[in-house]
């Protein structure tokens, strides 16, 4: 059997996944089973859209449970103190300024399981993170973004 991919995440990210898993197993699963029971009571299952919808939801919930269990099983916790404090790496927050417009941005580089660009968390697999990883303060880096390449200067790493 091939070795499963490590899922890099912070301790906080792992706790969120564990909470979601608990919710799915204890509450959501029961809600879906109840929906299936109610839909079955409507009679003929061959043309029962409520039943079909509930079964699809059940498949989604069970798939998500399986996905989360796999991520937790293969979790590699990112310790905040790991690595050189002056080098952009997994778990670090990096602040940079776009050249030449001067706009400052800040992102924390996390594992893909907990990335959320709206919260300033980008996946270590993203093109932007890949461009920044391994660089130090004052480095000028060409960063790949969905809108194309941009030049940035790293201001702070923490």
Swiss-Prot record:
Question: The organism sits in which domain of life?
Answer: Bacteria
Q: Which GO terms describe its molecular function?
A: DNA binding; RNA polymerase binding
Q: Which GO biological process entries does UniProt record here?
A: DNA-templated transcription elongation; regulation of DNA-templated transcription elongation
User: Where would one find coiled-coil regions in this protein?
Assistant: 10-76
Q: Which InterPro entries match?
A: GreA/GreB_C_sf, TF_GreA/GreB_CS, Tscrpt_elong_fac_GreA, Tscrpt_elong_fac_GreA/B, Tscrpt_elong_fac_GreA/B_C, Tscrpt_elong_fac_GreA/B_fam, Tscrpt_elong_fac_GreA/B_N, Tscrpt_elong_fac_GreA/B_N_sf
Per the UniProt record, one Pfam family is GreA_GreB_N
Q: Which UniProt keywords apply?
A: Coiled coil, DNA-binding, Transcription, Transcription regulation
Database matches in PANTHER family = TRANSCRIPTION ELONGATION FACTOR GREA (PTHR30437:SF4)
Q: What does this protein do?
A: Necessary for efficient RNA polymerase transcription elongation past template-encoded arresting sites. The arresting sites in DNA have the property of trapping a certain fraction of elongating RNA polymerases that pass through, resulting in locked ternary complexes. Cleavage of the nascent transcript by cleavage factors such as GreA or GreB allows the resumption of elongation from the new 3'terminus. GreA releases sequences of 2 to 3 nucleotides.
Q: Which family does it belong to?
A: Belongs to the GreA/GreB family.
The protein here is known as: Transcription elongation factor GreA
């Amino acid at each position: 059997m091939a070795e499963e991919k490590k899922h890099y995440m912070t301790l906080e990210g792992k706790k969120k996944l564990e909470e979601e898993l608990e919710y799915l197993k204890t509450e959501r699963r029961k809600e879906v089973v109840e929906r299936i029971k109610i839909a079955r009571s409507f009679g003929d299952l061959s043309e029962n859209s409520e039943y079909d919808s509930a079964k699809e939801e059940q498949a989604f919930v069970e798939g998500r449970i399986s996905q989360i269990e796999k991520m937790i099983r293969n979790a590699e916790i990112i310790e905040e103190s790991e690595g050189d404090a002056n080098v952009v790496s997994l778990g670090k927050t990096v602040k940079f300024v776009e050249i030449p417009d001067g706009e400052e941005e800040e992102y924390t580089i996390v594992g893909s399981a907990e990335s959320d660009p709206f919260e300033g968390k980008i996946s270590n697999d993203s093109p932007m993170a890949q461009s920044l990883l391994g660089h130090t303060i004052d480095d000028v880096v060409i960063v790949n973004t969905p809108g194309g390449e941009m030049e940035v200067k790293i201001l702070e790493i923490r």
